């Protein structure tokens, strides 16, 4: 860029500088002093998103030879800040930031012509090699000619003239691994690479100046650098677009689509898509050329040679995300020069580069499987709109570059892009890479990254807008056949091998691509415009870590890991092998992805079309990628947050390995490279593409977002043909799923593609119904079924997504393959198991029978998971009910279908389970007992909802709310020991009745009133707010007078006087206290002792329930007396509403005139139709055990308390004791300690306590319970929980007759009690069934209490209770 200072619109001719349009040879003349380019744009002009675009250019897009692209230069300053973030620069200031990023699919191979060309572009998302090269894998992912990519500006320290020598990546790997640090290796790489860059910057034209390399290496924005690396190694910030061959529109689109879906192309698409959504052709052309260039560089051993040692570091870093040795390295290395030089040297060795490009493409394709990102760029947006221009932005990172040149954005129209013909890209433009060098400024400048956005990959004729901060952005569109390029390069054989291997292993390619792509979709990482470094880094890392990439990038060796046949890969992904366009982009994607990750991370989403974004997204967002990665690349992308590194590990791993990264939870969008050394330069994964990329994606931004969110539902059809199956929600399963669901469809082959096998670690659990797993497109261009999102019932889908995602790696490998359309069938199959398991799964761990789950859920099918459960899961499902449910949900195609199938399938399954041992009485009875237990447990919950109604929600009122209340009657409804209660309504909630509790105690004392800080309970008074208010004296005086006389004069006495009192708002409106109840029921006790005493037992049971709840929270009431126990009308009907309505009249009836009626009802205690609800009130004396406070001072004070005080031993059984006294008082007996004062002065025995008259069968039990509670020794005193169980035994049995047997053994008694419990449960269910069909009989409080008892009863506890009652 520095070489040219002015940009004007020209017709660019092959061989001329794309920035200044002068002969590139002129720029090349001075390697060390690149000609100043047209004035470079200010840094600000660089678009953050452009870095990705720049990346495309970095990737070395070659214009097709036959067409003369017009370049519209648009001054822009691209900032790849995101890339910088991702770039980990341990290098000195000279080497500002070098991201060694190997894109997973990148082939290191360069065209022979381009062999000398080394594109060193830092790759976004690629961190500096951490330790050994990313390609350190045994697989020669990074071919020997492994150029350092992302070594922009590394060359700043190195003479531009230094020629980059292709380095054997494996060799480098060994050497680099030895390097103590990635930085050191990186520096070595930079040095070597800069040398190599100058030498190999241009395949055909030697890189005159290594300085561009340096620039490219240090370029601030790796992703930008990645783009710019396409420039010569010389100091131009020349963005060389190598072998930019837009495939035939169809081919490109197919490639894109297939690549995106397949993953072969998608890496390329990913990269390019990341940057922009150029036509797929363009993507492929742009990205592939990049790769080619990189490969070309690699192909030229002289270039890489110097870098060999550094290449190892590169490999390491590329594994981190830098595609050093990969085709990206090769292709990228040319970019690197561009980055460094900002040079327009589209170093394209017409034959070698292109051939390498082809080779790269092929290899990349295979590699892409390993390195989804790289492959992606070639696979331009598979459905880019042809009419839309391609926007290529070149962003130059100038960290170390002393001269901050700002390349002007250029627009280059490529009449036609590279076309993938069969296995190779045919470049429509034969012209070789124009290797224009910018002036000396280029060297200091950081390599610019060119992002090419192809709106319509299908369009052969594209307008490429190159926006390069460095005015020197060279873009050539040499159009040579991919084969030509492949064969032309000395490394062509390698490329061919890689390609062939891909072709031979198309599935592997696809897998690799998928993995690669997901690794770092630049667009996906919206958060980082320049963040593409991360995403590229991840894909390269993935590829490198997988080792597939290295082979792909450098030669056949890596490609062997990758599927040999791109076509096959495409096929695997749902694209027919015959769809060469799709397959080739895969190869290109490798290369491009390697570069692209740089910009993909950050800027790709901006201008990129959704399709291209999808490609990018495929890596990060499997969904959007899924569309483009119909090959199954989407699998990786399926996790909304593709592990960019995952794709590298997992994506390339998909081919030959399981994706370790993918195996991580899908929720973790970014997976670190397998090699921590690679991670050395690895930057944190870019945040999942969010607003920016997603927003950018016109079609599937929401889809991508959903994918990134790991949405259980499949992405919207916006991803055409992208049926990303997020099998497990884990990246590993994602890859499998995407392939499985490619095309959202039945194409199980795709799902079973090697990608899946690679991910077999986590067998993908497909969400047939459109779970996120389904999002990844396996089909090349087929939009996912529109209903895909909806296919999963919402209930099912949310649980599915979660269940499957969290649930289990145990993937139904077949299921991922299932189309969403098949989901219903699957659901049915799964539905039965869910039912059988549904009973088990519930909240109860009953595994007695599969139907242990709630019948209601199982039969209703309301539980999405129930249908999801498979027959296999029904029994085993007990262990993992959630998983089963999720699986079922995902399988369900629609909520309706799920629920209906759940009801049928579940019921059938449950029935099958229940009838499995129908021949055995014991087995049948055991299952029936379990069913009743589960049913009662559900009934308890339902009754709680019925009786509690809306009481569970806490309300808070303050003094400002006092004016909102209006008394229903001027007479109190209840006078308790501590307060007077009035019924009132609230203007904010006129339908509800509240009680206004006016405390009798003086204001200062009651001001400290506070209700216990415990959860709402049916038997604890709920404090909805208390405050001090001025209350008329008449309201306080009336109760006393009214209790004795009407005293009508009392109100008139002080009508105007007011008194400050503590006012408490409660929801429970009491009609009387227990004291009133006892006083009014003396006659009824004599008349109907059994009825009355039974009611006393119910009141005591409610008291024990409330006290037990308080004790669970460490609260001791300490003031249990009849006056503090309030009775509230409780006669619920079929719904909570009726219970509320009665309270209104009741409250109104509390008016003086109606008081007698209420009293009469209460008086007849036993005669009262409905059992009253007991409320514990007045907590003024309550104590809470110390230790729960968070106040430091209080903790210090408590630390000095004696053990008996801390443990509150004196209060431990305080409430139990007072409960014993209440038994006497409720049975109309005086407090024994009042009658016999001597009992308080000495230790007493049970015999000393006064006896209770035996009036009913409950009397002996109540007396025994009172004695147990009044034990003088607190240690011998029973606890409130035991008292509760004794009361339950008294109320519902078992009776003495049941256990009166001659010397029965305890085991026999337990068996007897177990059978008794089962029988009582069956009778209770029958009672509920009868009440359900009786209009006037609703569930009563007694029924709820009985259900509580029977649901929790067990023989051991019953035996203990019987012993306490002395019935045994």
Curated annotation (Swiss-Prot):
Region (Required for homodimerization): 906-949, 1293-1368
Start-end of Basic and acidic residues biased regions: 502-518
Keywords recorded for this protein, A-Z: Cell junction, Cytoplasm, Nucleus, Phosphoprotein
Biased composition (Low complexity): 317-330, 522-535, 550-563, 887-901, 1145-1162
Phosphotyrosine: residues bearing it: 238, 343, 391
Post-translational modification: Phosphorylated by CSK on Tyr-238, Tyr-343, and Tyr-391; Tyr-391 is a primary site of phosphorylation.
Ranges of biased composition (kind: Polar residues): 414-434, 564-574, 652-666, 707-717, 725-741, 1134-1144
Primary location class: cytoplasm
Effect of residue 939 to E: Does not affect homodimerization
Domain Protein kinase: residue ranges: 940-1291
Lineage top rank: taxon: Eukaryota
Keyword Nucleus: yes
Phosphoserine: residues bearing it: 667, 716, 753, 797
Tissues where this protein is expressed: Highly-expressed in brain, including cortical and hippocampal pyramidal neurons, as well as in kidney, spleen, colon and small intestine.
Gene Ontology terms for molecular function: identical protein binding; protein kinase activity
GO biological process: cell migration; negative regulation of neuron projection development; positive regulation of Rho protein signal transduction; regulation of cell motility; regulation of cell shape; regulation of Notch signaling pathway
Location within or outside the cell: Cytoplasm; Nucleus; Cell junction, Focal adhesion
Mutagenesis / variant outcome for changing residue 1362 to E: Does not affect homodimerization
GO cellular component: cytoplasm; focal adhesion; nucleus
Quaternary assembly: Homodimer. Dimerization leads to the catalytic activation of CSK. Interacts (via C-terminus) with RND2. Interacts with CSK (via SH2 domain) in a Tyr-391 phosphorylation-dependent manner; this interaction potentiates kinase activity of CSK. Interacts with NOTCH1 intracellular domain (N1ICD). Forms a complex with N1ICD and MAML1, in a MAML1-dependent manner.
Entry comment, domain topic: The dimerization region encompasses helices both from the N- and C-terminal of the protein kinase domain.
Chain's role: Catalytically inactive protein kinase that acts as a scaffold protein. Functions as an effector of the small GTPase RND2, which stimulates RhoA activity and inhibits NGF-induced neurite outgrowth. Promotes Src family kinase (SFK) signallig by regulating the subcellular localization of CSK, a negative regulator of these kinases, leading to the regulation of cell morphology and motility by a CSK-dependent mechanism. Acts as a critical coactivator of Notch signaling.
Name the record gives this protein: Inactive tyrosine-protein kinase PRAG1
Organism the protein comes from: Rattus norvegicus (Rat)
Lineage, highest ranks first: Eukaryota, Metazoa, Chordata, Craniata, Vertebrata
Gene for this chain: Prag1
């Amino acid at each position: 860029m520095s070489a040219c200072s002015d940009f004007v619109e020209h017709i660019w001719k092959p061989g001329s500088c794309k920035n200044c349009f002068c002969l590139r040879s002129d720029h090349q003349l001075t390697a060390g002093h690149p000609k100043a380019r047209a004035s470079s744009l200010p840094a600000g002009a660089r678009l953050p998103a452009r870095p990705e675009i720049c990346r495309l250019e970095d990737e070395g897009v070659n214009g097709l030879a036959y067409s003369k692209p017009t370049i519209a230069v648009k001054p822009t300053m691209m900032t790849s800040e995101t890339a910088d973030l991702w770039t980990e620069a341990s290098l000195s200031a000279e080497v500002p930031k070098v991201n060694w990023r190997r894109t997973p699919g990148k082939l290191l191979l360069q065209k022979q012509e381009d062999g000398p060309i080394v594109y060193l572009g830092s790759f976004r998302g690629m961190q500096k090699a951490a330790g050994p090269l990313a390609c350190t894998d045994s697989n020669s992912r990074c071919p020997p000619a492994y150029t350092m990519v992302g070594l922009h500006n590394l060359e700043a320290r190195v003479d531009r003239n230094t020629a980059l020598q292709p380095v054997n990546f494996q060799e480098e790997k060994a050497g680099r691994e030895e390097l103590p640090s990635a930085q050191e290796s990186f520096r070595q790489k930079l040095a070597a690479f800069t040398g190599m860059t100058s030498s190999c910057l241009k395949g055909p034209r030697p890189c005159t100046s290594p300085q561009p390399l340096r620039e490219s290496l240090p370029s601030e924005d790796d992703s930008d650098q990645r783009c710019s690396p396409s420039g010569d190694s010389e100091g131009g910030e020349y963005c060389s677009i190598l072998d930019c061959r837009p495939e035939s529109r169809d081919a490109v689109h197919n490639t894109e689509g297939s690549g995106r879906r397949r993953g072969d192309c998608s890496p390329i698409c990913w990269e390019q898509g990341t940057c922009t959504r150029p036509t797929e052709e363009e993507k492929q052309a742009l990205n592939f050329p990049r790769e080619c260039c990189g490969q070309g560089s690699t192909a030229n051993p002289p270039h890489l040679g110097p870098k060999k040692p550094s290449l190892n570091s590169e490999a390491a870093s590329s594994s981190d995300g830098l595609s050093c040795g990969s085709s990206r390295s090769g292709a990228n290395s040319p970019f690197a020069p561009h980055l460094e030089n900002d040079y327009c040297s589209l170093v394209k060795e017409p034959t070698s580069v292109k051939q390498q490009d082809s080779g790269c493409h092929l290899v990349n394709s295979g590699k892409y499987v390993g390195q989804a990102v790289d492959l992606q760029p070639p696979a331009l947006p598979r459905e880019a709109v042809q009419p839309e221009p391609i926007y290529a932005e070149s962003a130059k990172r100038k960290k170390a570059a002393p001269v901050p040149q700002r390349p002007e954005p250029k627009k280059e129209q490529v009449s036609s892009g590279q076309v993938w013909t069969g296995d190779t890209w045919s470049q429509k433009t034969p012209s070789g890479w124009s290797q224009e060098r910018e002036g000396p400024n280029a060297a200091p400048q950081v390599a610019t990254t060119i992002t090419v956005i192809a709106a319509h990959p299908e369009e052969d004729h594209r307008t490429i807008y190159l926006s390069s901060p460095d005015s020197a952005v060279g873009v050539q569109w040499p159009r040579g056949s991919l084969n030509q390029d492949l064969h032309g390069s000395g490394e062509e054989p390698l490329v061919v091998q890689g390609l062939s291997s891909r072709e031979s292993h198309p599935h592997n390619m696809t897998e690799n691509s998928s993995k690669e792509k997901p690794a770092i979709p630049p667009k996906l990482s919206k958060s980082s415009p320049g963040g593409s470094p991360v995403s590229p880094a991840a894909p390269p890392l993935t590829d490198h870590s997988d080792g597939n990439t290295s082979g792909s990038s450098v030669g056949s060796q890596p490609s062997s890991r990758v599927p040999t046949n791109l076509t096959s890969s495409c096929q695997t992904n749902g694209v027919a092998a015959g769809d060469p366009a799709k397959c080739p982009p895969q190869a290109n994607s490798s290369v491009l992805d390697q570069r692209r990750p740089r910009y993909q991370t950050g800027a790709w989403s901006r201008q990129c079309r959704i399709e291209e974004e999808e490609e990018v997204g495929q890596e990060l967002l499997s969904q959007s990628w899924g569309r483009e990665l119909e090959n199954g690349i989407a699998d990786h992308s399926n996790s909304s947050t593709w592990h960019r590194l995952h794709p590298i590990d997992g994506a390339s791993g998909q081919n030959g390995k399981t994706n370790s990264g993918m195996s991580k939870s899908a929720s973790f969008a970014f997976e670190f490279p397998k090699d921590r050394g690679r991670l050395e330069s690895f930057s944190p994964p870019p945040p999942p593409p969010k607003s920016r990329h997603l927003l950018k994606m016109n079609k599937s931004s929401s889809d991508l977002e959903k994918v990134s969110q790991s949405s259980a539902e499949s992405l919207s059809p916006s991803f055409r043909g992208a049926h990303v199956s997020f099998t497990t929600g884990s990246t590993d399963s994602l890859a499998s799923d995407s392939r499985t669901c490619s095309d959202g469809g039945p194409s199980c082959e795709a799902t079973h593609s090697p990608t899946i096998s690679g991910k077999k670690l986590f067998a993908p659990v497909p969400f047939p119904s459109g779970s996120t797993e389904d999002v990844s497109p396996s089909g090349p261009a087929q939009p996912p079924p529109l209903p895909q999102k909806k296919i999963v019932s919402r209930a099912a889908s949310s649980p599915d997504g979660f269940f499957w995602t969290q649930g289990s790696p145990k993937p139904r490998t077949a299921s991922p393959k299932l189309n969403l359309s098949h989901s219903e069938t699957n659901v049915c199959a799964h539905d039965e198991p869910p039912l059988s398991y549904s009973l088990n799964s519930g909240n109860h761990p009953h595994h007695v029978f599969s139907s242990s789950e709630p019948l209601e859920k199982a039969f209703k099918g309301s539980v999405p998971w129930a249908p999801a459960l498979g027959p296999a899961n029904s029994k085993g499902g007990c262990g993992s009910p959630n998983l089963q449910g999720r699986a079922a949900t995902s399988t369900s195609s629609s909520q309706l279908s799920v629920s209906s199938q759940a009801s049928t399938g579940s019921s059938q399954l449950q029935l099958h389970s229940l009838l499995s041992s129908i021949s055995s009485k014991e087995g049948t009875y055991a299952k029936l007992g379990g069913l009743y237990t589960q049913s009662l447990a559900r009934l308890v919950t339902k009754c709680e909802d019925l009786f509690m109604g809306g009481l569970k929600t806490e309300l808070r009122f303050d003094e400002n709310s006092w004016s909102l209340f209006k008394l229903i009657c001027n007479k109190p409804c209840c006078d308790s020991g501590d307060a007077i209660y009035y019924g009132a309504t609230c203007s904010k909630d006129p339908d509800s009745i509240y009680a206004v509790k006016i405390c009798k105690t003086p204001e200062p004392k009651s001001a400290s009133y506070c209700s216990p800080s415990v959860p709402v309970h049916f038997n604890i008074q709920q404090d909805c707010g208390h405050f001090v208010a001025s209350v008329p004296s008449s309201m306080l005086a009336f109760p006393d007078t009214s209790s004795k006389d009407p005293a009508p004069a009392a109100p008139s006495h002080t009508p105007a006087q007011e008194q400050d009192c503590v006012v408490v708002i409660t929801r429970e409106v009491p009609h009387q206290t227990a004291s009133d109840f006892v006083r009014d029921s003396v006659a009824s006790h004599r008349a109907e002792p059994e009825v009355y005493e039974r009611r006393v037992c119910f009141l005591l049971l409610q008291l024990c329930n409330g006290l037990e709840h308080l004790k669970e929270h460490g609260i001791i009431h300490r003031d249990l007396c009849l006056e503090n126990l309030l009775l509230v009308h409780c006669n619920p009907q079929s719904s909570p509403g009726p219970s509320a309505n009665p309270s209104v009249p009741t409250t109104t009836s509390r008016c003086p005139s109606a008081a007698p009626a209420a009293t009469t009802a209460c008086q007849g205690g036993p005669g009262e139709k409905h059992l009253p609800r007991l409320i514990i009130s007045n907590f003024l004396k309550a104590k809470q055990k110390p230790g729960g406070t968070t106040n430091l001072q209080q903790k210090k004070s408590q630390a000095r308390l004696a053990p008996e005080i801390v443990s509150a031993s004196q209060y431990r059984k305080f409430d139990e004791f007072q409960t014993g006294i209440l038994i006497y008082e409720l049975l109309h007996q005086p407090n024994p300690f009042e009658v016999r004062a001597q009992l308080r002065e000495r230790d007493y025995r049970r015999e000393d306590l006064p006896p209770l008259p035996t009036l009913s069968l409950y009397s002996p039990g109540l007396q025994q319970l009172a004695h147990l509670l009044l034990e003088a020794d607190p240690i011998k005193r029973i606890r409130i929980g035991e008292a509760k169980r004794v009361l339950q035994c008294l109320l519902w049995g078992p009776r003495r007759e049941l256990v009166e047997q001659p010397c029965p053994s305890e085991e026999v008694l337990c068996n007897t009690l177990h059978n008794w419990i089962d029988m009582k449960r069956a009778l209770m269910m029958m009672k509920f069934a009868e009440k359900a069909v009786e209009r006037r009989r609703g569930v009563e409080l007694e029924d709820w209490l009985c259900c509580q008892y029977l649901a929790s009863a067990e023989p051991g506890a019953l035996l203990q209770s019987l012993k306490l009652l002395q019935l045994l």
